[in-house]
Amino acid sequence: MEVDQVNLVQQFKEDCRVRGLAKGTCDIYPASVNAFANFIDPKPLQEANKSDLKSYLSYLRLDRKLRQASIERVFSALATFYDYLIEEELIAMNPVRPVQKRYLRAYKDTDESQMRRLISVEEASQLVNSILDTRDCAIVLLLLKTGIRCSELTSLDLENVDLKEQTLRLKPTAKRSNRVVYFDNEAATALLRWIAVRQNRNIKNCPALFLSKEGTRLERRGVHALVTKIAENVGLHNPSSPRMEEHFSPHNCRHWFTTHLIRSGMSRDFIKELRGDIRHEAIDIYNHIDKKELRESYLAHIPQLGI
């Protein structure tokens, strides 16, 4: 197994500890991932697909002759690992879930518990209004109001913010088809409050929009830590639970953004444009969206949180 793969599994083990999982689980889960990594070697773990997992299932069941309960535990560990990769924005989808759903009965019994948590507008309001720190409030509001990824947020520089036009210009990435996203008056208010005090923290003349306490660019892990802590304080995140629906992280903000725009009746094409989803079909290239109409629709549909 390559060095970077070893480091990835070690980071996953540390994440299990941070989540408060039992010590035995923190040892067994990474061991299960290592065994799978050796099985698919030299393919990287991030590139594993359903075919690899079905082959591994066959190997465990027919060659190793493991009992059903043991196989289910192995795939539970793998599913948790790939959920972690999604959280770290290293992959887009968990390849384990479809295999569990079709071939492992335990997954069918617990499928509902593996759904990503969706909080209500009222809970989002409670979350935001519980935040006292101006930086943290601006971070959470931007994540909720724009649906941008954690990595996109941390890569923002101060110069990427246009308060007059209420837009963010994101850095180019392979995951996003657009670079300009909108925010509303509530997010603008939070940003203004943060920018007013930002210079006091900018002891290293860093261009980043969001700074750490040391005056350096805030990293993804820092954003993840502050979001989960704030959510835990208001009862929206349970770090000791293995159930996905009891966790709340920056990616849940993107889930919240998308789902509540859908529920408010916004055009799905507009939502895809705001999310920056990559266009997969040739006809999508010809689907030009009017930016003024897009902005007006966004402002009409984005939920208000009463800050």
Task: Please name every model-derived segment.
Residues 10-24, 30-110:
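N-terminal core-binding DNA-recognition domain of tyrosine recombinases/integrases
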Residues 275-300:
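Catalytic-site neighborhood detector that most strongly recognizes the C-terminal catalytic loop/helix
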Residues 155-190, 281:
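Conserved tyrosine-mediated DNA breakage-rejoining catalytic core shared by Y-recombinases
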Residues 1, 301-307:
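C-terminal secondary-structure termini that scaffold catalytic or DNA-interacting sites
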Residues 91-93, 104-125, 175-186, 202-206:
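DNA breakage-rejoining catalytic core of tyrosine-based enzymes
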Residues 121-150, 177:
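Basic, Lys/Arg- and aromatic-enriched nucleic-acid-binding interface segment
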Residues 173-193, 205-229:
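C-terminal catalytic core of Y-nucleophile DNA break-rejoin enzymes
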Residues 224-269, 273:
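Short, basic (Lys/Arg/His-rich) helix/loop patches that form interaction surfaces
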